[in-house]
Amino acid sequence: MSWQAYVDDHLMCEVEGNPGQTLTAAAIIGHDGSVWAQSSTFPQIKPEEIAGIMKDFDEPGHLAPTGLYLGGAKYMVIQGEPNAVIRGKKGSGGVTIKKTGQALVFGVYDEPVTPGQCNVIVERLGDYLIDQGL
């Protein structure tokens, strides 16, 4: 399966319990910032944004004072899981980022999709990739 198919079929899929609803944007990006695959709606991410996200995985709380930036948009960092998941909130939407051995799995959502629904979609694929050694 191509990386684009993972984004299209497993991240931009219909949200369970919300017929016709999907995440706003999604991507799989290498730890080095290289884009493996992304939805057409995913923002243009900057190298320093990936560097900040990677640093927060290594040093949980690093992004809390400044916020998490994704394509220039600022998200307030909310509870995550050290070295595994970072979650951000912006207005009625937000972002979930799951770290795997080689990549970062991003899911961006807006209402009516809930933070919990986004977490399930992103973390399910991330856990699968970890199980595959990726």
From Swiss-Prot:
Subunit structure: Occurs in many kinds of cells as a complex with monomeric actin in a 1:1 ratio.
tRNA processing recorded as keyword: no
Cross-referenced PANTHER family: PROFILIN (PTHR11604), PROFILIN-3 (PTHR11604:SF35)
Annotated function: Binds to actin and affects the structure of the cytoskeleton. At high concentrations, profilin prevents the polymerization of actin, whereas it enhances it at low concentrations. By binding to PIP2, it inhibits the formation of IP3 and DG.
InterPro entries: PFN (IPR048278), PFN_euk (IPR005455), PFN_sf (IPR036140), Profilin_CS (IPR027310)
Transmembrane segments: none
UniProt-recorded name of the protein: Profilin
SUPFAM superfamilies documented for this protein: Profilin (actin-binding protein) (SSF55770)
Entries under PROSITE patterns matching the protein: PROFILIN
Pfam families from the UniProt entry: Profilin (PF00235)
Gene3D superfamilies listed in its UniProt record: Dynein light chain 2a, cytoplasmic
Similarity remark: Belongs to the profilin family.
This protein's UniProt keywords: Actin-binding, Allergen, Cytoplasm, Cytoskeleton
Record-level Gene Ontology MF annotations: actin monomer binding
Gene Ontology annotations for the cellular component aspect, listed alphabetically: cell cortex; cytoskeleton
Subcellular location: Cytoplasm, Cytoskeleton
Major subcellular site: cytoplasm
